[in-house]
Amino acid sequence: MSSRLPIGVVLGSVGVDVRWWLDSARRLDAAGYAGVWSWDHFVSRGVRTDPVLEAWTTLTAAAMATERVTVGTFVANVMNRHPAVLARMAAMLQEASGGRLVLGIGIGGHPAEHEAYGIDFPPAPERARHLEEAVTVIRALWTGGPVTRPSDLYPLRDAYAYPVPNPAPPILIGAGTPAGVRLAARIGDGWAAEDDTFERLVPLYGEALDAAGRERAGQRVVLGFGGRRKRGADPLAAEPLLVAPREELARWRDLGADDLLLTARTTDDVDALVDAAERW
């Protein structure tokens, strides 16, 4: 790849081991991809005994194993961790990575996982309330504190949080519904979108930014492809973004995306990505 294109890769974290994940991250970094991203799950939706990599420890190891790529969550589940703890984890990863973290965060969507782990999973509107307050808590703690705020969800009292991340990581709101997109426009530094809903929702995102009095130029829209593609399905080598990346990138940018993410679940997928980068 002659120069880094804004194309990153979500590396599957289900049914793989951490050595594969880190080796893949190193290969993609060397090939010139812009970032490596992780899902945030604890349990497989398929075979329950499949290994599932924890997102934040995996990304921290990846930051140590790479030199240039962004590391990010696509996306963290707000219900999985108290936002004060998440703020501290993200701040440390931002420092460890030399400022390469992007925090994507959303309301989650795997209720069986929550039931298995005893983690609350209220209805979507209530999870959205958790998300909005969590973003407020995270940003407040990233100032270093002290932070005191009464709350029925996440109260804080004289909370300090050092070291302060500098710069603070951008926070992308994962959303695939109209309500989620409106929330992303109102509180996010950008929107983490998926290809199956993006074209339908992107006009609403622009309208919601206008309604919130926010400029589109200050936002980052990251669009993920293939998140629902089954492991071992159609080969990634046939993905249009790999065949004609600049043309496809221009097309999706015209539609409103800034960065594009492909999903790789297997060594064959990573091989296809590396081979494609050598041709560009």
Language-model segments: residues:
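Active-site-adjacent structural elements that line small-molecule/cofactor binding pockets in enzymes
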Residues: 1-280
